[in-house]
Amino acid sequence: MKKIHIKKPDIKGAIDKLKNLKKEDVIRHFKARKERRARIIEARRNSAFARKMQPVYKFMNRFSLVFHALLACIINFAIEAISRHSLVEAWIYMTGSPLVFLYNAFMIFVTFSIVYLFKRRVFVRIIISVFWMILGIANGYMLLKRVTPFNAQDLKIASDGLSLINKYLDGFEIILFIVGIVAVVVWMISMWRRGGQYDGKIHHVRALIGIVVCAVLYVFVSNQAVDKRVVSTYFGNIAFAYEDYGLPYCFMASVFNTGIDEPSGYSKKTMEEIGQNGKLTESKITNAKTKKTKPNILFVQLESYFDVDNAEFFKTSQDVCPNLHKMFKKYSTGYFKVPSVGAGTANTEFEVLTGMNLRYFGPGEYPYKTMLKDHTCESAATALGKLGYGTHALHNNGGNFYSRARVFNNIGFDSFTSKEFMNILQLTENGWAKDAVLVQHIMDAMNSTKENDFVFTVSLQGHGDYPTEKVIQNPRITVSGIDDEALKNKWEYYVNQVYEMDQFAGNLIKAVEKRKEPTVVVFYGDHLPTMGLKAEDLKSRYLYNTNYVIWDNLGLKKQDRNIPSYQIMSEVFERLGIHSGTLFNYHQTRRKTKNYLSDLELLQYDILYGKQYVYNGKKPITEGHMKMGIRNVTLKNVVPHLDEGYSLYGENFTKSSKVFVNDEKQDSTFLNNTRIDLDETELKNGDKISIVQMGSSDTVFRKSDEYIYKDGKLTVQKGTGTDTTKSWVPQADGDK
């Protein structure tokens, strides 16, 4: 067997060469390199393959526009097939909506117009094609993991990097992802080096004029497509929109069409007229009884809830929501018009809490993510806070979901109790937290303040995706009238979750009644479940309707009416004689007047994107002050194990409680709300121990005071934890 001899590098010789290197040597090197490159290119041009491809390149250059049109159609079909996970579905889309298909193909065609600026036209075509195919592959993969398509918001959180990859890819898929990226990069480099070049003269001015013409033509075609309702600028459900209007249009709309464009007629004078010269920003209570008692106001958003009695294609073995039906008969109720179908929980929240109409924002936009995550805005919390209410938000899901922890801080809440501050023992068969846990936390929030409270609760139990397999072996409620077994299983799972959500609603009312405090409780559904419902399946014949009811112990008159989500808060305020919050006052005074909606658009623009003329320099909120959680996490003692490790005993631990020793996170095991074990940590005298309530992406929501460990005992260092009198956000960002 031959031995492999590795030549020892001549480092000393290389250093000597560098020392003696002259300018002429460098010039000679690059000149030789250029000549060598020219010879290689010439050889490739004269190669057998190049000679065979010359007629192809010549044909492609002569009929390049036709070629681009065909290529755009092929790419469009390919990305739709990948997105829909079916060639058949892509064909049905193409033949069923030919104008939509051609519009999206035209968008891709326009992007190919830039190739005329380059000699390496084949390579530029490849780059553009790869870009569109990556979008299609990303969307198709995302839809295997979730119901929301790939959109601009995913790009905005791409900085999360590893956490995002770990969320959607397992180990094998990460390897495939890396191999795929490397393969594409290698192929593109190869095509850059070996691809043919355009031999003619590049007319940059003509090319730029052509690009401008294509862009102008695209704008014209887009306006016509919207006017003729080929596509829409409003997405009630972003997943359905991608199916109806295609990936290219919907993705680009999510990138470029966000926020509210400045409406015509926007000016200081106009806003002074709409603001009624300052009256809209006033805060007052005109009802004497309300002024005296200040009733608690509770809003409960029920995930994917609607009254299943409104579905006409199946029946249930018993009443699915007896408690809510009882309330429907006695208290004000009706259909609740929401901005989305099958998804978009945060957008219903947004309309309810701010009084803003989502229709004026970009298609498929989530203002929580695009605006309120980083900017303050008045809301029901600020409106009631001005009147002396304590304001609290609760949700039995992660605090970072939809950026709620930052959003609620920016819209004026005093506290937010998320999943990280709850001991959730009951989960659905799909792994979502059940809503029963919320009752005690709502009571805790109300008990945390001396004054009466506004509590906004977002439930979770009804969340999809709904299993096609029979996962509840002995369901309390069964479904009949559905022949498809998979669909029947989905509805049977759903109605049993709704039944338990109804039990939660009933138990909450019982808990409120025990307090014997004047209270109003509003229950409503955020959107219909993701079940592929059609308008003809429902009694209301409308997919944007859920249900609401306003329970009270004040003796309010029953007044049934259908109401959109952006008006519900002002409706409740008006019945109580509360006039606070610019948009809520606007709805109360202008709801049935001329130009109500057009002036609402102006008002929303002025508040979020304009010069805030309506506030006249007195903005309702300039910074947040919200704390995360209600209860303090405390340590009482530490007990060493017989072999190694320790048990920490204290109060209010949850699964999100992480132990830090000297500011370093430890491996720990949560056992219950009073005990956490440290199996591998060795404590020394003087060590500082703290408990952090940690969210996703290692977000520090709240930190306990530090405890000094000495001789088996703990001494608290008061004032070393999160300052709950100030906003949690800058403190967490400082820790990061």
Task: Kindly label every feature range from the protein language model.
Residues 221-299:
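Membrane-interface segments at or immediately adjacent to transmembrane helices
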Residues 282-290, 302, 307-736:
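Solvent-exposed soluble domains appended to multi-pass membrane proteins
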Residues 10, 25, 157-160, 323, ...:
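Exposed alpha-helical structural elements
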Residues 1-38:
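N-terminal targeting leaders characterized by basic, low-complexity, disordered sequences
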Residues 35-242, 685-688:
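Transmembrane and membrane-interface helices of multi-pass
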Residues 161, 297-303:
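Residue-level preference for non-acidic, small/hydrophobic
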Residues 152-155, 238-251, 342-343, 433:
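Membrane-interface micro-motifs in multi-pass membrane enzymes
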